[in-house]
């Protein structure tokens, strides 16, 4: 069993502190089917999994329709993850990236809402 899968199988209360600290960033995860699933304020963000020697992140685009498939992105190779620090760097980078995506998405939604309200106002 490789190191990645071992990390995935560690029980919640024995997980490294950095994973427990994700809650302070407004994110949380669940251990399900050997994957870490992150959600941001209740919105599914992405999960990390390992197939062979490649680490993948499967994530939802903020504005995709319900019929669109969840895109899968290669976020690194297992051979490049020589320590837990390497794993944390990948995770931390992804969390920051998706946090920014969510902020942008909310901003866009607010802009669209304002435009709709303006149209309604002009029509009356």
Task: Describe the residue ranges of each PLM region.
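N-terminal Sec-dependent export signals
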Residues: 1, 95, 101-111
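Negatively charged, low-complexity tracts enriched in Asp/Glu with abundant Ser/Thr
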Residues: 1-40
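Residue-level detector of alpha-helical secondary structure
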Residues: 5, 12, 16-23, 88, ...
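Generic alpha-helical secondary structure signal
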Residues: 16, 23, 32-33, 40, ...
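Intrinsic disorder/low-structure terminal segments
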Residues: 18, 27-28, 35, 39, ...
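Intrinsically disordered, low-complexity regulatory segments enriched in Ser/Thr/Pro
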Residues: 37-97
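Short acidic, low-complexity intrinsically disordered linear motifs used
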Residues: 104-124
